[in-house]
Amino acid sequence: MTQISPTRLHSPLDRLLVEAQRALDTVFGNPPAERPNPAADTPDVVLDPEQRRHAAGLMRINHVGEVCAQGLYFGQAAVARDAHTQHHLLEAAQEETDHLAWCADRLHELDSRPSLFNPVWYAGSYALGALAGLRGDDWSLGFVVETERQVEAHLDEHLETLPQNDQRSRAILRVMKIDEARHADQAEQAGARPLPAPIPSAMALASKLMKTVAYRL
């Protein structure tokens, strides 16, 4: 993936090209992970067709979640007012790139593919991130906290509902969950603003729709 660096000093055209390249890398590329795959030392097992289909559906949801996280963070970083906030967002995005690569690897192992709607998921998340960022960095960080808490919840659900013998997927999700919790904690420490009640509910509803579609497509 294109090196993630602050964009504040770039010209408007440079920034547009950087954002376009990030979108292409996230949606259509195969970004390499900086950290080793957590499942590397976990032996694979033979899953029956139904188990494989279910595991692939869950990992596709998790892959979409990382596509959305990239869009959200890049949208927020593009309009961040404070250099420290922008750095925090881009640093979190880099770790989410690891998650994206790990989920893509696992989908390949399961003979499956990413969601056909990834361009839509990314565009919607980028727009949401930019809108949140325009309200102020405290709002932007508030969206980070709520997003990561909701992701933690669905990772817990997936850890429970994956096929019992699919330990490779579990190894990936456990590390992802640790990272997401840390991102939320760091955003809170950086001055995140609690979001008004209707916003988390709307985010949860949108997430439910995404998961329903991504599980199959």
Swiss-Prot record:
This is 3-demethoxyubiquinol 3-hydroxylase. Pathway: Cofactor biosynthesis; ubiquinone biosynthesis. GO terms for molecular function: 3-demethoxyubiquinol 3-hydroxylase activity; metal ion binding. Fe cation 2 binds at residues 96, 148, 180, 183. Its cofactor is Fe cation. Belongs to the COQ7 family. It holds the Pfam family COQ7. It catalyses: a 5-methoxy-2-methyl-3-(all-trans-polyprenyl)benzene-1,4-diol + AH2 + O2 = a 3-demethylubiquinol + A + H2O. GO terms for cellular component: plasma membrane. It is found in: Cell membrane. It comes from the Bacteria. Binds 2 iron ions per subunit. CDD domains: DMQH (cd01042). Keywords: Cell membrane, Iron, Membrane, Metal-binding, Monooxygenase, Oxidoreductase, Ubiquinone biosynthesis. It comes from Xanthomonas euvesicatoria pv. vesicatoria (strain 85-10) (Xanthomonas campestris pv. vesicatoria). It is a peripheral membrane protein. Its EC number is 1.14.99.60. InterPro entries: COQ7_proteobact (IPR047809), Ferritin-like (IPR012347), Ferritin-like_SF (IPR009078), Ubq_synth_Coq7 (IPR011566). Signal peptide: none annotated. Its main location: membrane. Gene3D superfamilies: 1.20.1260.10. Fe cation 1 binds at residues 66, 96, 99, 180. Catalyzes the hydroxylation of 2-nonaprenyl-3-methyl-6-methoxy-1,4-benzoquinol during ubiquinone biosynthesis. One of its GO terms (biological process) is ubiquinone biosynthetic process.
